[in-house]
């Protein structure tokens, strides 16, 4: 007869406290573009300067984006060597894939190295790896390649997430929370890496959604380490606690945001009413998440909202009557990097905790105790993660 019960085994396997973010790292390519110069560059390299009306429309898109600069892996030299990437609908998937299956894990590795450095623990302590990208797809996946590049243990437990889009930053936190809280001692390395070579193409009068993508998206990678029961004796210190996580599909939103992999690469599709769909439905997610905590004033929480574009942030602010400073971290990230899809929210988390410390705020969450992290993406899918900040002076 066994000396222990299943219940005893399960109890021993589970962590005592909540999952926490223990470290954050980010990385971007070296190639930086000023947004003000991008329309001239884009129409020149795609040999589309004769499309003067469309160029004016694109210039207005770039001006309204509120983006100052973006980092892009694709250089003019890349495009000269592969001119079919500059055509609107030319077969080019193989060229894109050959580049991305190498570069996506490499950029992710750089962000992970920075997170591991901040964490200060040997990488042999990493028990799980979650890798997320919408830029490429391969077998074995980018998770395998990144684990090899980092020199992680062969026994590290890997999760590979492909083709999720802009809500994925919330999703990876939800998965990491479940892993960390149900596996005592687990240390989960999250890596989100995006390179827009998958969607770069010339302009078309028939597909203005393509121009929206060209005006908004940037390249970048972010990484966080998640674990429960931080070990203060070795210097582990939480940055945020993960309290709850939820996902929902918004009503009447089929086709609002979509991406399709074709012979011409990844095509991007967007309905005009995306900001309205999100702003009209977001309060339901907030009520479900914060009613158990006793919070119903959305100005009393800190905000980490995926910046799909300025219109989304504007309409959420207006609908919920938020003070302008609530979206400060999201707007700052959008301005400095553009929309980096799944990698974006962790740049914002990083900005939030750094600014809180710099400005002498009492907590990592802009001086507030509770906050919400939101991801918005294809579906239309919304991820909601409730965060609990920690004191900055500990």
Swiss-Prot record:
The active site is at 166. It is an enzyme of class 2 (transferase). Changing residue 385 to L: In strain: cv. Osvals's 72. Its EC number is 2.3.1.156, 2.3.1.74. One of its GO terms (molecular function) is naringenin-chalcone synthase activity. Pfam families: Chal_sti_synt_C, Chal_sti_synt_N. One of its GO terms (biological process) is polyketide biosynthetic process. It comes from the Eukaryota. Keywords: Acyltransferase, Transferase. It catalyses: 3-methylbutanoyl-CoA + 3 malonyl-CoA + 3 H(+) = phlorisovalerophenone + 3 CO2 + 4 CoA; (E)-4-coumaroyl-CoA + 3 malonyl-CoA + 3 H(+) = 2',4,4',6'-tetrahydroxychalcone + 3 CO2 + 4 CoA. Signal peptide: none annotated. InterPro entries: Chalcone/stilbene_synt_C, Chalcone/stilbene_synt_N, Chalcone/stilbene_synthase_AS, Polyketide_synthase_type-III, Thiolase-like. Optimum pH is 7. Expressed in lupulin gland. Present at low levels in leaves but accumulates in cones. Expression level is directly related with bitter (alpha) acids content, thus influencing the bitter taste of beer, cv. Symphony and cv. Ember having highest levels. Homodimer. Belongs to the thiolase-like superfamily. Chalcone/stilbene synthases family. Involved in the biosynthesis of prenylated phenolics natural products which contribute to the bitter taste of beer and display broad biological activities. Polyketide synthase that can use 3-methylbutanoyl-CoA (isovaleryl-CoA) and 2-methylpropanoyl-CoA (isobutyryl-CoA) as substrates to produce phlorisovalerophenone (PIVP) and phlorisobutyrophenone (2-methyl-1-(2,4,6-trihydroxyphenyl)propan-1-one), respectively, intermediates in the biosynthesis of the bitter acids (alpha and beta) acids. This is Phloroisovalerophenone synthase. It comes from Humulus lupulus.
């Amino acid at each position: 007869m066994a000396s222990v019960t299943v219940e005893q085994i399960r109890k021993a396997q589970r962590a005592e406290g909540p999952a926490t973010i223990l470290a954050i790292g980010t990385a971007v390519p070296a190639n930086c573009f000023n947004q003000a110069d991008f329309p001239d560059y884009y129409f020149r390299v795609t040999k589309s300067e004769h499309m003067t009306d469309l160029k004016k429309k694109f210039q207005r898109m770039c001006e309204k984006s509120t983006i100052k600069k973006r980092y892009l892996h694709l250089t003019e030299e890349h495009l000269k060597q592969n001119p079919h990437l500059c055509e609107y609908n030319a077969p080019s998937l193989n060229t894109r894939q050959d580049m991305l299956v190498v570069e996506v894990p490499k950029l992710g590795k750089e962000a992970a190295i920075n997170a591991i450095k901040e964490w200060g623990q040997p990488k042999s302590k990493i028990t799980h790896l979650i890798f997320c990208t919408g830029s490429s797809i391969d077998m074995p996946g980018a998770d395998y390649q990144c684990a090899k590049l980092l020199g992680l243990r062969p026994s590290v437990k890997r999760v590979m997430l492909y083709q999720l889009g802009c809500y994925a930053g919330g999703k990876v936190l939800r998965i990491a929370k479940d892993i960390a809280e149900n596996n005592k001692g687990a240390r989960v390395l999250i890596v989100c890496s995006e390179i827009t070579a998958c969607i770069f193409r010339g302009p078309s009068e028939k597909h203005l959604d393509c121009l929206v993508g060209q005006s908004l998206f940037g390249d970048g990678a972010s990484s966080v380490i998640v674990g429960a029961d931080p070990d203060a004796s070795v210097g582990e210190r939480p940055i945020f606690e993960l309290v709850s996580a939820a996902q929902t599909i918004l009503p009447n939103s089929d086709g609002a945001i979509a991406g399709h992999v074709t012979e011409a690469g990844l095509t991007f599709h967007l309905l005009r009413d995306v900001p309205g769909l999100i702003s009209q439905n977001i309060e339901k997610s907030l009520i479900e998440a914060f009613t158990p905590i006793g919070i119903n004033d959305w100005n009393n929480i800190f905000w980490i909202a995926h910046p799909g574009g300025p219109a989304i942030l504007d309409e959420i602010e207006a609908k919920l009557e938020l003070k302008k400073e609530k979206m400060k971290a999201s707007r700052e990230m959008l301005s400095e990097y553009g929309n980096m899809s799944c990698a974006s929210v962790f740049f914002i988390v990083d900005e939030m905790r750094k600014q809180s410390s710099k400005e002498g705020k009492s907590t990592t969450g802009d001086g507030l105790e509770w906050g919400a992290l939101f991801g918005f993406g294809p579906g239309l899918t919304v991820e909601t993660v409730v965060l609990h900040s920690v004191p900055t002076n500990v």
